[in-house]
Amino acid sequence: MITTRFAPSPTGFLHVGGVRTALFSWLYAKNNNGKFILRIEDTDLERSTQEAVDAILDGMSWLGLKNDGEIYYQTKRFDRYKEVIQELIADGKAYYCSCSKERLEELREYQQANNLKTGYDGKCRDANYIPQQGESYVVRFKNPQDGVVSWDDAVKGRISISNHELDDMIIQRADGSPTYNFCVVVDDIDMAITHIIRGDDHVNNTPKQINIYKALNANVPVFAHVPMILGPDGAKLSKRHGAVNVMQYREDGYLPQAILNYLVRLGWSHGDQEIFSIEEMIKAFNLEHINASPSRFDFEKLKWLNKHYIKESKFDDIQTEVEYHFAKIGLDISNGPDLKELVAVMAEKVDTLVELAEKSSYFYSDDISYDENAVKKHIKASTGEIFVKLLENFEALDAQQWQDPDVLYNIVSTTAEQCQVGMGKVGMPLRVAITSSGQSPDIGITLKLLGKNKVVARLTKALEELCK
């Protein structure tokens, strides 16, 4: 069975590069009816935090990238790592090393001064050293000294590294803790991982890991090293480019559907298709069409996709996110129009859900502050007379008539005729009175969504406060 994994370290936030790796791994497993494993690589005890673990889990949940089975934590597998280390020592494939930090520093200085390759010189490799109680030691892996390590990378093609370039790496530190390159191999073997999709910053780790697979007589998985994501300027993606906690995109009003759709096309292609549902991603995804070159993060493209999903999604699919943003700014959605109807009207005017909530606030909050520029521009000496006539005409409408935007628009038009002014002399002051600014959807639709009671109350307030 095809089995992939996403194995983040909880030493920082989950950013878009990590999300894309997780997405590619998840899609490949789903495309092949396989399994997707989530493993938290928390062996760095000093830097790993529960806060970072929670952020990773929250991000994966928000995006809908559900793992199969339990979530694995490396810190709960230390006994297993120690067991395998002892097996390697017993088989002569690893050894105890007593070299002090001072000796290793002197060795490195000597190598650098003489333009030699830096790395461990193998002093303890064949010394058959057995540590005595109280002595400080590490355990090193016996890397092959001859030949090359080669693999056919699913993205980068054939890669070969001479074993002469690799030294005997430490697999157990002096404090007894196992090291990253060793742990991941044991994990991937035990979890039957068949395909490892990860960032190309791991390419240099791969030959070391392959040698450990071989030493443990295990099958070597397929590696697919995905190029990094660059900022719009071609520099390494940083916080100013968007390398922030993926949950910040939620706070900024982006839909998970838009994030996933954007990231799947960032370095992978399927003809000219730009819009993908989750089902379409799963059906189309493969490793062959991952681009070997880095991709640039394009905020405008992400914003365009987000607008598309706000406009085109079924309301049920985005309702939770919409309600989240309305609640975030303190809006009571029970005190206004049906949210589904509102989104259908406002979607064309916004790029994010933050904009949607902010630009729709007057529909739900009666605590509105008039825009001074709009008041100055549209409220004139004659406006009071117009408001009086509007109130008179609106009061005459019954509940059924108020549900028809065309009827409401015609009332505004009729009022303009009655007051012998142009439509703009009525519509714009009316907008200011009922929305606090000069901007809103079509006036008939705005009136319908606000409802008769709100419109009458706000017109009355405007008449008292703006038309003195």
From Swiss-Prot:
Catalyses: tRNA(Glu) + L-glutamate + ATP = L-glutamyl-tRNA(Glu) + AMP + diphosphate
UniProt keyword terms in alphabetical order: Aminoacyl-tRNA synthetase, ATP-binding, Cytoplasm, Ligase, Metal-binding, Nucleotide-binding, Protein biosynthesis, Zinc
Cofactors required: Zn(2+)
According to the UniProt entry, the coiled-coil residues are none
For this protein, the Enzyme Commission number is 6.1.1.17
UniProt-recorded Gene Ontology molecular function terms: ATP binding; glutamate-tRNA ligase activity; tRNA binding; zinc ion binding
The short sequence motif called 'HIGH' region sits at 8-18
Top-level class of the enzyme under EC nomenclature: ligase
Q: What does UniProt give as GO cellular component? A: cytosol
GO annotations under biological process?
glutamyl-tRNA aminoacylation
What CDD domains does the entry give?
GluRS_core (cd00808)
Q: Which domain of life is it from?
A: Bacteria
> Where would I look for the motif 'KMSKS' region in this sequence?
236-240
Entry note: cofactor = Binds 1 zinc ion per subunit.
InterPro entries linked? aa-tRNA-synth_I_cd-bd, aa-tRNA-synth_I_codon-bd_sub2, aa-tRNA-synth_I_CS, aa_tRNA-synth_I_cd-bd_sf, Glu-tRNA-ligase_bac/mito, Glu/Gln-tRNA-synth, Glu/Gln-tRNA-synth_Ib_cat-dom, GluQ/Sye
State where the protein is found: Cytoplasm
Positions annotated to bind Zn(2+)? C97, C99, C124, D126
Instruction: List residues binding ATP.
Output: K239
Q: Which residues cross the membrane?
A: none
Query: What is known about its subunit structure?
Result: Monomer.
- Give the family, as the similarity comment puts it: Belongs to the class-I aminoacyl-tRNA synthetase family. Glutamate--tRNA ligase type 1 subfamily.
List, alphabetically, the NCBIfam families matched: gltX_bact
What role is this protein assigned? Catalyzes the attachment of glutamate to tRNA(Glu) in a two-step reaction: glutamate is first activated by ATP to form Glu-AMP and then transferred to the acceptor end of tRNA(Glu).
Kindly provide the name given to this protein in its UniProt entry: Glutamate--tRNA ligase
